[in-house]
Amino acid sequence: MKYALRGITAEELSYTMNRIKMDKDTKFEIKPQFSRTVRRVQENDKLWFLALEVKVESTDDSPKPFNVKARLVGVFEAEDVNDDVDKQDLVINMTEIVYPYLRAAVSALTANSFINPLILPVIPAGTMFPEDRGEAPSNLN
């Protein structure tokens, strides 16, 4: 299997400050929520799109000083993707390629909002999503 990144686009980048009352020494638990969508172009079966998204949202139960949402889309060209194992490997590899760009976008977005930058953790390839770890059936087209 051969694949190559052809481009990355920021489909959505948003930051919203939440004006919440807090003590000076309050610590917030920031738990980013990740999601991923994979599409294959039917007219050109070599073309793949991977959308990787992260959200940090304030709730009544878990208030946060801000909301962040970032979604990047990577465009890939891939050949010799012959079976489900190849597809799963390709999806994991595409995720591994796009994720550092997502980390950088979130850090820049929060830093440019004049707060301490949110730095997403380094996550090893194949462990970000349950289906990559074999914990749930994958639904890839």
Feature locations, PLM:
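N-terminal intrinsically disordered, cationic/polar leader segments
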Residues: M1-I97, A104-N141
